[in-house]
């Protein structure tokens, strides 16, 4: 996500690219309904039945796969499990690795159970697994990038109405390379302060709605996308510092995404790059990732 980070859970607009790394899985169907899975990236194996997924996370790497099973079983009858080996070339906790492993495993379960899901349904099932089983309050950016992205195109997605566009690289765009650096720091969003920051953004939306006399409903439904920026500018000084920072990131990032999509469309890679660096700066200092 070059521009649009940390705004999908607030129903913002985002951009995304495909990368040439990912998750690979070799598998076969198991008529018994048992899932037996081994990862070449971790020492332990995991096993469960497709219709008896543990109610709670086991706090290991396979929780994402259990979540995928749980989310799919809510939508379709499952009769077959899988026996497989999974391997990834993505850094753990980075580059959408959790979304990638969920979608890879969902695809395998769908294949052996003869289930045909639309792209949007695949995204929402993967999001359900991560939100409601693993317990990460993420939005749909990562899942959408995994499903929709196309080589030499920029994904431009509105996470509020799910409309998206794949903007092709302009024929006159200057040559460029995108470098991704692995810091060596691995993380697990479920065990980080990620959820707290999402709640701070929701709290800012909830408070701004109240200050402005808007109908603010339930906390879970409060999103900054539903609060006009003019309201934020009017009442931002009343917000606690952390809430104000999260909201500042959202509103400035929303503007950067729109400008970035237009810069990409006209082939201005330098402008797009500047906006991407500004996005990273805001992620560090306003979102405090």
What residue ranges belong to the model's regions?
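C-terminal nucleotide
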Residues: 24-60, 71, 153-289
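Short N-terminal signal/transit or membrane-insertion segments
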Residues: 99, 103-118, 245-261
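ATP-binding N-lobe of GHMP and related small-molecule kinases
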Residues: 1-96, 103-120, 124-134, 138, ...
């Amino acid at each position: 996500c070059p521009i649009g980070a940390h705004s999908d859970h607030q129903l913002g607009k985002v951009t995304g690219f495909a990368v040439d790394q990912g998750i690979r899985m070799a598998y076969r169907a198991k008529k018994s309904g048992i899932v037996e899975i081994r990862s070449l990236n971790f020492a332990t194996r995991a096993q469960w039945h497709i219709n008896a997924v543990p109610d709670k996370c086991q706090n290991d790497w396979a929780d994402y796969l259990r979540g995928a099973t749980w989310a799919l079983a809510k939508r379709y009858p499952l009769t077959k499990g899988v026996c497989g080996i999974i391997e990834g070339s993505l850094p753990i906790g980075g580059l959408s690795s959790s979304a990638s492993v969920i979608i890879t495993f969902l695809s395998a379960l769908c294949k052996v159970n003869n289930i045909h899901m639309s792209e949007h349904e695949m995204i929402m099932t993967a999001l359900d697994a991560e939100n409601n089983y693993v317990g990460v309050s993420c939005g749909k950016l990562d899942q959408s990038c995994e499903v929709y992205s196309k080589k030499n195109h920029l994904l431009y997605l509105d996470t509020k109405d799910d409309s998206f566009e794949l903007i092709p690289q302009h024929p006159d765009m200057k040559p460029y390379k995108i470098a991704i650096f692995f810091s060596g720091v691995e993380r697990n969003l479920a065990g980080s302060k990620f959820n707290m920051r999402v709640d701070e953004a929701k709290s800012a939306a909830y408070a701004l709605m109240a200050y402005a006399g808007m109908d603010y409903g339930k906390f879970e439904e409060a999103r900054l996308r539903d609060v006009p920026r003019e309201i934020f500018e009017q009442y931002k000084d009343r917000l606690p510092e952390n809430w104000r920072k999260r909201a500042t990131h959202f509103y400035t990032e929303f503007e950067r995404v729109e400008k970035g999509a237009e810069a990409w469309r006209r082939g201005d890679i330098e402008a797009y790059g500047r906006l991407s660096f500004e996005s990273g700066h805001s992620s560090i200092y306003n979102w405090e990732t």
